[in-house]
């Protein structure tokens, strides 16, 4: 049940959660086979998260190896994965699971030296859980690029046989069946929507990954100038004009920043990066 409620006098009635499964399944008597292609990079952060204070308001005793916290977090990770797969199996038969995680060869750091450097140092427990995914859950390490690029590579081969599982908005630049396990939400992203999502991100960037390459250009501007029915050339022109506006008519800077944003945002098939 969703925590959102509606009230009638003193009675509060829970509003059922809609996971949107009806938008992608018409016959629930038939279970399609799906290959689950999972962006697992967020799981170590989610499963090791602790609030500053416990339920009684006391300072939290954070997980450490010494106090057995790493084992607790590993148990949470195992339960999280099992819970996600159980939810998927309510509607699909899981043929294969690919848990994808990042490696150490990311060309985006060569294209932009400050890429993701503004993030705080990764906690030891997150690194521990990352290794657990590899050692105990047979996670696939991206040999080049990021976990998202591994997913792109797999989906290029699998097509609609894949169920893309993750919470990163970058994944919504891929067409296909999607499951956001955090929101418990299914959707199908068609080619037009995926392309619109991609060019929107190129235009406004991603502050969680890299510096703002198009100053003062935000979501509202993107919604105003981009349209889902645009051709590729129309997208390029509209996005270029946005960068030109951001860099006050400086053609060279606008072109340079747009090309860089394109490279950073794009999910690459491994063959394109070799």
Placement of each model-derived feature along the sequence:
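Domain-level signal for Mg2+-assisted phosphodiester chemistry and nucleotide/NA-binding surfaces
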Residues: 2-131
């Amino acid at each position: 049940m969703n925590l959102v409620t509606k009230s009638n006098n003193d009675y509060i009635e829970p509003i059922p959660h809609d996971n949107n499964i009806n938008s992608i399944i018409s016959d629930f008597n038939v279970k399609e086979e799906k290959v689950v292609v999972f962006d697992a990079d967020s799981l170590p952060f989610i499963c090791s998260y602790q609030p500053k204070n416990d339920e009684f308001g006391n300072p939290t005793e954070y997980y450490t190896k010494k106090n057995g916290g790493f084992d607790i977090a590993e148990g949470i990770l195992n339960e999280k994965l099992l819970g996600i797969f159980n939810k998927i199996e309510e509607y699909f038969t899981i043929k294969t699971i690919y848990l994808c995680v990042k490696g150490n060869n990311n060309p985006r750091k060569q294209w932009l030296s400050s890429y993701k450097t503004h993030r705080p140092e990764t906690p030891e427990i997150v690194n521990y859980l990352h290794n657990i995914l590899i050692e105990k859950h047979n996670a696939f390490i991206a040999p080049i690029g990021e976990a998202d690029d591994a997913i792109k590579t797999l989906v290029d081969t699998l097509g609609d046989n894949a169920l893309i599982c993750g919470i990163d908005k970058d994944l919504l630049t891929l067409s296909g069946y999607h499951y956001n396990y955090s929101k418990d939400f299914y959707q199908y992203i068609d080619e037009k929507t995926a392309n619109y999502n991609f060019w929107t991100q190129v235009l406004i960037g991603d502050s969680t990954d890299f510096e703002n390459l198009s100053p003062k250009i935000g979501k509202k501007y993107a919604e105003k100038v981009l349209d889902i029915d645009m051709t590729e050339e129309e997208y390029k022109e509209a996005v270029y004009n946005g960068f030109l506006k951001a860099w006050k008519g400086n053609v060279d800077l606008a072109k340079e920043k747009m090309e860089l944003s394109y490279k950073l945002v794009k999910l690459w098939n491994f063959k394109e990066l070799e």
